[in-house]
Amino acid sequence: RQRHPDCDKPPDTGN
């Protein structure tokens, strides 16, 4: 799956 690194990883800060 080719996606943005920001979207691939879960929201740590949940911002």
UniProtKB/Swiss-Prot annotation:
<keyword id="KW-0638">Presynaptic neurotoxin</keyword>
<protein>
    <recommendedName>
        <fullName>Kunitz-type serine protease inhibitor homolog T1-2 B chain</fullName>
    </recommendedName>
</protein>
<dbReference type="GO" id="GO:0090729">
    <property type="term" value="F:toxin activity"/>
</dbReference>
<comment type="subunit">
    <text>Heterodimer; disulfide-linked. The A chains have phospholipase A2 activity and the B chains show homology with the basic protease inhibitors.</text>
</comment>
<comment type="function">
    <text>Neurotoxin T1-2 is a presynaptic neurotoxin of the venom that exhibits indirect hemolytic activity against human erythrocytes. The B chain is homologous to venom basic protease inhibitors but has no protease inhibitor activity and is non-toxic.</text>
</comment>
<dbReference type="GO" id="GO:0005576">
    <property type="term" value="C:extracellular region"/>
</dbReference>
<comment type="similarity">
    <text>Belongs to the venom Kunitz-type family.</text>
</comment>
<feature type="domain" description="BPTI/Kunitz inhibitor">
    <location>
        <begin position="1"/>
        <end position="15"/>
    </location>
</feature>
<keyword id="KW-0800">Toxin</keyword>
<keyword id="KW-0964">Secreted</keyword>
<keyword id="KW-0528">Neurotoxin</keyword>
<keyword id="KW-1015">Disulfide bond</keyword>
